[in-house]
């Protein structure tokens, strides 16, 4: 049973990677409304997640963990959101919370640390 769960969790990371590649994320990208809409559509289709609802949640990290997102998947999602969504206070707070959450678990994300500064 544990092997099955680990495989399912790994699939989430793989799907996020495929979405990032499909949308051209991974390099330096200037966020645009079109890119935000594309990412939102992909996340809705693949994971039934709405970006705007996620950003408004009181504890989005708990929500993602409950949905089976691994630390790696949470990191990838935060990076994709940073690259696809125009910077707002809410997004910056979410990314800072992701960094703190991962740090507390002993998972260091150099990419997210470089974003937070």
Residue ranges and their predicted role:
Residues 10, 15, 76-83, 114-117:
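"A position-specific structural signal for the A-helix of alpha-solenoid helical repeats
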Residues 3-4, 8, 69-76, 90, ...:
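Structural signature of alpha-solenoid helical repeat junctions
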Residues 1-72, 100-101:
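N-terminal alpha-helical interaction modules that lie
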Residues 82-117:
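Amphipathic alpha-helical binding modules
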Residues 61-94:
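Charged low-complexity stretches with an acidic bias
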């Amino acid at each position: 049973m544990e092997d099955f769960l680990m495989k399912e969790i790994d699939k989430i990371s793989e799907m996020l990677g495929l979405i990032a590649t499909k949308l051209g994320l991974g390099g330096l990208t200037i966020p645009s409304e079109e890119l935000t809409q594309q990412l939102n559509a992909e996340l809705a289709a693949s994971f039934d997640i709405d970006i705007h609802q996620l950003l408004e949640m009181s504890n989005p990290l708990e929500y993602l963990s409950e949905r089976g997102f691994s630390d790696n998947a949470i990191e990838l999602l935060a990076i994709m959101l940073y690259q696809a969504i125009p910077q707002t206070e809410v997004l910056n707070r979410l990314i800072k919370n992701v960094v703190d959450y991962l740090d507390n678990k002993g998972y260091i994300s150099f990419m997210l640390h470089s974003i937070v500064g």
